[in-house]
Every structure is written in C-alpha cells, then in structure tokens.
Design a protein with these regions (language model features):
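Short basic helix-loop element that most often maps to the first helix and adjoining turn
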Residues: 24-45, 70, 104
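A short, Lys/Arg-rich alpha-helix, primarily the initiator
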Residues: 2-33
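Short, charged recognition helix plus adjacent turn
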Residues: 7-8, 13-16, 73, 83-106
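DNA major-groove recognition helix of helix-turn-helix/homeodomain DNA-binding modules
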Residues: 1, 66-81
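Conserved hydrophobic/aromatic packing and binding residues within compact polymer-binding modules
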Residues: 26, 40-41, 53-56, 82
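Recognition helix of helix-turn-helix/homeodomain-like DNA-binding domains
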Residues: 44-62
Length: 106
C-alpha cells in the first residue's frame, strides 16, 4: 500500500483505503455465498451488469447508497451489519498502513 502514498495525497489515501475495504468486503460476501457475477446480478432488484459488479469488487466504482442497500438485502444483512463489516475491514487496512509508516520511520 506504500505506493498509494506516492500517487495520492493524504486525504485521498484515506478515501482509497475505504474504497478497498468496500471492494474486498463485497468480494468476500459474494464468495461466501458462492455466487457468480451472473447469479448475484439476478438476485439484485436493481439491474446491473456483471462488469459493474466486477468494478465494485475491484474498487473501480464507488458504491452508491441504493446499491449498498441492495447488497445488504441480498446477503441477508441489515445495513448496519454490512456497514460494520466494511468498517472492520477499513480499520484493518488503516492499521496496516500505520504499521508500515511506523516501521519506515524507525
């Protein structure tokens, strides 16, 4: 993750880690439920392409609130539960980044 610091400013770096946390959480949930992109797309009430789902999981597309609610519903989670999963991943990513910086400063 050290390369992000070269490419982004500090405020954008925080946003980048949040985007990574969202992407990884969505990918983990899809795999946990053994859904292909096509199966997941069929379960969502809002029509999205497999490519859009892939972009969410790669962090190339930011998740809008309506899609956040859709994913929570498909994975049988309350919005709060999905938020907490993402938040835990985000905290983990920031902790890793902080450890990297601390090691470099020593």
């Amino acid at each position: 993750m050290g390369n992000f610091q070269k490419e982004y400013g500090e405020s954008e770096l925080i946003d980048t880690y949040l985007n990574i946390a969202v992407a990884e959480t969505l990918k983990e949930l899809r795999k946990e439920y053994n859904y292909s992109y096509s199966e997941l797309a069929n379960k969502l009430t809002k029509k999205v392409s497999r490519q859009t789902l892939n972009n969410y999981e790669l962090g190339k597309s930011k998740l809008r609130m309506d899609m956040f609610m859709e994913f929570a519903k498909v994975y049988h989670l309350t919005p709060k539960e999905l938020y907490e999963k993402i938040n835990m991943k985000y905290i983990s990513k920031l902790s890793q980044y902080t450890e990297e910086i601390t090691k470099k400063e020593k």
